[in-house]
Regions:
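Oxyanion-hole/transition-state-stabilizing segment in secreted/luminal serine hydrolases
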Residues: 61-77, 86-124, 144, 148-152
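Catalytic His-Asp segment of secreted/periplasmic serine-dependent ester chemistry enzymes
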Residues: 152-226
Length: 226
């Protein structure tokens, strides 16, 4: 879709004139095919039992190597693929979401979306489409959105990221099956900027201390089996 058409589409979306799927129709997810194939190969060897808690999204999920240790006693599944956007998780939902029949999906994405030039409104639209895709097959599943994190390397985009978080938070407040997990404020120091000691040397990805903070915030949001 040419850039002018994209702009018009986003305007129409904001006015409620366009289906949310239309904005992301031209997104190409093919670059992730080999990673998804690896997940499916692993599933053929040992399929996670249904009713688990699926973590999905970009590198902050992929690099969460201590996920199982951080949430002992909970059936967590890691299906993060680094560099991905919300639209990619939506595109592959039929292969790495629906088959697991999870009771909860914890999504971290949106960071790369904003860095790639997507507007906060488009981030919201993509999230809404992901939710629609999930609930089309799993109507009772809880979808939890981990807020886009503030980072040293992308601080210049913090205004757009905060706006996207606000939009998603508002949307989550309108559906009891949705959950917004705020990690934004806890990652900021007294100066209002990201705490450097939470990051690896690249100023983008989390270190062990960063994941420990996330664990403490995310844990109360995880759904135990009823």
């Amino acid at each position: 879709m040419p850039s002018v058409q994209k702009s018009l589409a986003r305007l129409a979306l904001a006015c409620g004139m366009l289906p949310i799927a239309a904005v992301t129709a031209d997104h190409d997810s093919s670059r992730w095919e080999k990673y998804i194939a690896r997940f499916q190969a692993a599933d053929k060897k040992q399929m996670p039992p249904p009713g688990g808690i699926l973590f999905i999204g970009s590198s902050s999920i992929r690099m969460w190597k201590t996920l199982k240790q951080d949430f002992p006693g909970l059936p967590v599944i890691n299906r993060g693929f680094g560099g991905s956007q919300i639209a990619d998780s939506n595109h592959f939902a039929g292969r790495i979401v629906h088959p697991y029949k999870p009771r909860q999906i914890v999504l971290y994405a949106g960071d790369n979306d904003v860095a790639a030039g997507k507007s906060p409104e488009t981030v919201l639209a993509d999230f809404q489409q992901f939710v629609k895709t999930v609930h089309g097959k799993l109507p009772k599943a809880r979808v939890s959105f981990i807020a886009i994190k503030p980072s040293l390397s992308r601080w210049k985009l913090s205004g757009k990221m905060a706006r996207a978080n606000s939009l998603v938070s508002d949307a989550c407040g309108k559906d009891k099956r949705l959950d917004y997990i705020d990690i934004w404020q806890p990652m900021l120091g007294d100066d209002g900027r990201p705490k450097p000691d939470l990051f690896l040397g690249d100023g983008l990805h989390l270190n062990a201390k960063g994941y420990a903070l996330w664990t403490s915030i995310v844990k109360p949001h995880l759904a135990r089996r009823e």
